[in-house]
Amino acid sequence: MKRTYQPKKRKHSKVHGFRARMSTKNGRKVLAARRRKGRKVLSA
């Protein structure tokens, strides 16, 4: 049986990347929350 996670850099960035987060209002909320929490890495 094939494993469910077949990593692809392009897709990962498109869905979870910084520019993807910045492109929507809720994505910006996510980044703000991660900044507030003090995350070293904000996005993938």
Curated annotation (Swiss-Prot):
Q: Which Gene3D superfamilies match?
A: 1.10.287.3980
Keyword Manganese: yes or no? no
Gene Ontology CC terms: ribonucleoprotein complex; ribosome
Entry keyword annotation includes Ribonucleoprotein = yes
Q: Which residues form a coiled coil?
A: none
- Which InterPro entries does the protein's record reference? Ribosomal_bL34, Ribosomal_bL34_CS
Which UniProt keyword terms apply here? Ribonucleoprotein, Ribosomal protein
| Pfam families reported for this sequence | Ribosomal_L34
Q: What name appears for this protein in its UniProt entry? A: Large ribosomal subunit protein bL34
| GO BP term, example | translation
Task: Please name the HAMAP family in this protein's record.
Answer: Ribosomal_bL34 (MF_00391)
Spans annotated as Disordered: 24-44
Q: Which domain of life is it from?
A: Bacteria
Q: Where is the composition biased (Basic residues)?
A: 26-44
Recite the lineage of the species. Answer: Bacteria, Bacillati, Bacillota, Bacilli, Bacillales
The record's comment on protein family reads: Belongs to the bacterial ribosomal protein bL34 family.
GO MF terms on file?
structural constituent of ribosome
